[in-house]
Amino acid sequence: MDKIRKQEIIAKHARHEGDTGSPEVQIALLTERINSLTDHLRTHKKDHHSRRGLLMMVGQRRGLLNYLYEQDIERYRAIIKELGLRR
């Protein structure tokens, strides 16, 4: 993910100007990285080091989603629908 793509994702999911830390932004950025790494692993099946990183990112995203679910279920449902994630 390059700098421009990252800024686009932040701008799309930010709750206010300069927002980079809200759960929605973090989840969207992790989803982009997870999708990119998943494509990489389809080609490089024996890259176990990257696979571990992928599993850690998925766990981190799951934790953020659980937090958002507990705090504000409407925001949770919106980000799930927008990113096309399944629960």
From Swiss-Prot:
One biological process term in Gene Ontology: translation
Gene Ontology cellular-component terms listed: cytosolic small ribosomal subunit
CDD domains registered for this protein in UniProt: Ribosomal_S15p_S13e
Record-linked Gene3D superfamilies: 6.10.250.3130, S15/NS1, RNA-binding
UniProt keyword Aminoacyl-tRNA synthetase, yes or no: no
Chain ranges passing through the membrane: none
Keywords, ordered alphabetically: Ribonucleoprotein, Ribosomal protein, RNA-binding, rRNA-binding
GO molecular function, one term: structural constituent of ribosome
Assembly mode: Part of the 30S ribosomal subunit. Forms a bridge to the 50S subunit in the 70S ribosome, contacting the 23S rRNA.
Matching NCBIfam families: S15_bact
Record family assignment: Belongs to the universal ribosomal protein uS15 family.
Function: One of the primary rRNA binding proteins, it binds directly to 16S rRNA where it helps nucleate assembly of the platform of the 30S subunit by binding and bridging several RNA helices of the 16S rRNA. Forms an intersubunit bridge (bridge B4) with the 23S rRNA of the 50S subunit in the ribosome.
Protein's name in the database: Small ribosomal subunit protein uS15
Species of origin: Clostridium perfringens (strain 13 / Type A)
Gene this protein is translated from: rpsO
